[in-house]
UniProtKB/Swiss-Prot annotation:
Protein family membership: Belongs to the radical SAM superfamily. RlmN family.
Residues reported in the UniProt entry to bind [4Fe-4S] cluster: 129, 133, 136
Cofactor(s), names only, from the UniProt record: [4Fe-4S] cluster
Protein name: Dual-specificity RNA methyltransferase RlmN
Listed PROSITE patterns: RADICAL_SAM
Any single GO CC term annotated in Swiss-Prot or TrEMBL for this entry: cytoplasm
């Protein structure tokens, strides 16, 4: 089967039936201007409405006081601003907040991580995940569907609404967004890219492209396409120093091996300004699986031609997982080897693990609709991005 990369189009402008309303959260600025053009309005109306939507977290047309009453009435007839609702909130002792967010009859999870100098939101891109990484709780839930643009950017909107809109508080509620929640973002490009465009847009959330990070496990055809679509920071879920280990814990490696993956990564960062010439390597530490000093030496040799910084992630356990968490001493020895080679190496501080909000622990509530044949194809054959 040949790879098919799905790119953003104007599908969001299509109303499924005459009684349905267009959810304006599904539209990036280009699509929003097309929407107002079709209403017979000037393009600047799109900018006005987006400013209300994202700077004030406003979802009521009647509150948009610089828009005339007639147009507000028209908007109420054909459009809505409907973000997914929070159905459960958990707060960690370290300040981390995890929200379970309803998307249809299921849930995804979004995590807010406040720090002294920043506030990061971890956003989901799919209901579940089809890649079956063995150390990840989300992967064990199976896969159901891709999230729509409104369900992705809606997580950011809802979090900002709860924490406090910038125009209301005077403080930016979210400084960084990481596409590291449930799902593989590159298997949902047609929705993830427009959502990230809204994150970057001055009339959207206005984030710097260096503060929006997409993390991928290695869907190479989509990564090759991504650089022509948008420029954001890139993090890669490597987790192994060789193909033998990675084949076992990250099954997509059987299709796109480490060499192929890193070649694609170098191609992306060579034309990216957001990455400042280097990529973030994510490496989960699994006890006596990939955490020996011999693995550290091997990883250093592997990455010698890839400008990068390395995040070592203490593994966060979940019920039934076949792994153990590396000891602090093993992580420390691993880190020291990498630093001796000159790599910037950071041991990620675990946040929110007491509420299962830490890396690899997000599970949501997923009805698994992944066909077994599709899973096997993803491990050993070409991936049809459109089919997932």
């Amino acid at each position: 089967m040949s790879e098919q990369i799905v790119t953003p189009d104007t599908a969001a402008l299509t109303v499924p039936n005459k009684d349905a309303k267009i959810n304006l959260l599904d539209l990036n600025r280009q699509q929003m201007r097309e929407f107002f053009k079709n209403m017979g309005e000037k393009p600047f109306r799109a900018d006005q409405v987006m400013k209300w939507m994202y700077h004030y977290c406003c979802d009521d047309f009647d509150e948009m006081t610089d828009i005339n009453k007639v147009l507000r009435g028209k908007l109420k007839e054909v459009a809505e601003i409907r973000a997914p609702e929070v159905v459960e909130e958990q707060r960690s002792t370290d300040g981390t907040i995890k929200w379970a967010i309803a998307v249809g009859d299921q849930r995804v999870e979004t995590v807010y991580i406040p720090e002294e100098d920043r506030a990061t939101l971890c956003v989901s891109s799919q209901v579940g995940c089809a890649l079956e990484c063995k150390f990840c709780s989300t992967a064990q839930q199976g896969f159901n569907r891709n999230l729509r643009v409104s369900e992705i950017i809606g997580q950011v909107w809802r979090a900002a609404k709860i924490v406090g809109a910038v125009k209301t508080t005077g403080v930016r509620p979210i400084t960084n967004v990481v596409m590291m929640g449930m799902g593989e973002p590159l298997l949902n490009l047609n929705n993830v890219v427009p959502a990230m465009e809204i994150m970057l847009d001055d009339f959207g959330f206005g984030l710097s492209k260096r503060r929006v990070t997409l993390s991928t496990s290695g869907v190479v055809p989509a990564l090759d396409k991504l650089g022509d679509m948008i420029d954001v920071a890139l993090a890669i879920s490597l987790h192994a120093p060789n193909d033998t280990i990675r084949d076992e814990i990250v099954p997509i490696n059987k299709k796109y091996n480490i060499e192929t993956f890193l070649n694609s990564v170098r191609g992306y960062i060579s034309k990216s300004n957001a990455n400042q010439g280097r990529v973030t390597i994510e490496y989960v530490m699994l006890d006596h699986v990939n955490d020996g000093t011999e693995h550290a030496h091997e990883l250093a040799a592997l990455l010698k031609d890839t400008p990068c910084k390395i995040n070592l992630i203490p593994w966060n356990p979940f019920p039934g997982a076949p792994y153990g968490r590396s000891s602090n001493s093993r992580i420390d020895r691993f880190s020291k080897v990498l630093m001796e080679y000159g790599f910037t190496t950071i041991v990620r501080k675990t946040r929110g693990d007491d509420i299962d909000a830490a890396c690899g622990q997000l599970a949501g509530d997923v009805i698994d609709r992944t066909k077994r044949t599709l899973r096997k194809r993803m491990q050993g054959e070409a991936i049809d991005v459109k089919a997932v």
